[in-house]
Amino acid sequence: MVSGKKIPGVIFVKDENDMNKKILAVWFVLLIILFFFLKSGFTSVRVMRFSETQETTVRELTDWKVSSSGQKDENGNYISTYTIKVPLIHNSSETMMFYTTHSDVSVYVEKEKIYTVSTNLSEKTFQAVRSDRWNQFSVEKAYEGKQLQVVLKTSYKSVAEQAPLFLLGNELDIVIRELKAALLSMFLAFAVFACGIAMCIYYVFSGKSRLKNYRTIYLGIFSAFIGFWFLINIPIVQFLFGNYMMLEYISYLIFGMLPIPFILFEKQIIDQKFGWLLSLIAVYIMLVQTGRVVLQMTGYMDLKESQTIIHVVILLSIAMFILLGIVNMYVNRGSEESLISRVNVIFLLVIAAGSGIDILTYYMYPQRGKEFNCSKFALLLYICLLYTSPSSRD
């Protein structure tokens, strides 16, 4: 039962389950309003231009001649070359932007280098492995009709075989275009994050009578961590943030902190006799992630090994979710929560399938595989299910 004490911004009722539903309903309505505000904001935004700048639309350049041998060079890297004639430039210059993963980039106009960025693929230090980035450079009016060549060098065959999306136009227009394209992904990430923050606040201010139910704070911490991790890994968000190195550190550390709720609250999540196994998996994942950052910083691990490890960690996380669901179903068999446990297992399998699809998408289409939309959607449904379902551990 919840205390009737009034706190600004929080409405308390006598029935706890009724309050949960009302809070969830308000949270959902706020997210819908946020979605439409974001959408209308991106649609109606005005682009400030110089007086001599003409109104142009963002163009996607597709007429590239692609040259890729599919063989490694002497340093063990794959090289792909994209060549095109510079199209009509409407103003004194336009901006070209494209997103690359794990690649060195060089751009030439008639063999004159105009842009280059190196991730130092031959190096193994963390400082050198700023792998995912937006490339942008100015295409001058004088370049019209000349040969533009983009050379990508990468350690991954799957990356070399996937052409980037080349966009030409006003820089702000390109950013707005990508924001619109990533609107659903940002919305889902923010929804998971906001759900976690809301549950943490609710747990703190709901009164001492509810402090025995640790499920709320566990879900809140986990949701906030993974929601923020989802958000900062969206490519266009990385561009807006600007500091790629800072995002690399934050991303790795947050992913390493995801198992913390499992360790802190495992006794409240599942029966104690199964808790040690869940904690063991969680500790292992945390140690792998922490070790990964340390090894990269000291230069003992290269990018390819790092990419493999993060997917192993994701797969272990999937296994942990499935284990959690199956054990809960086993513990609650024959009880009133049996049906709820079965539904939980179904949603956990959906999360596992979504994460598997996201990993597969990453290997098949590296440019489009970082938004994790399947995982976000499944996880959001599962969090809402757990938050609204009754619990026997109050």
Provide a role label for each language-model segment.
Residues E178-Q268:
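Core alpha-helical transmembrane segments of integral membrane proteins
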Residues G76-P87:
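Short beta-strands within extracellular/lumenal beta-sheet-rich domains
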Residues K5-I7, N17:
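Polybasic, lysine-rich low-complexity intrinsically disordered segments
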Residues G227-R393:
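Interfacial "cap-and-anchor" motif at the non-cytosolic start of specific transmembrane alpha-helices
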Residues D18-N75, T154-R177:
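Accessory carbohydrate-binding/adhesion or oligomerization-edge regions at the termini
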Residues H90-V109, V150-L152:
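Aromatic-lined ligand-binding clefts that engage carbohydrates, nucleic acids, or primary amines
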Residues V109-Q147, K153-A163:
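Beta-strand-rich ligand-recognition modules
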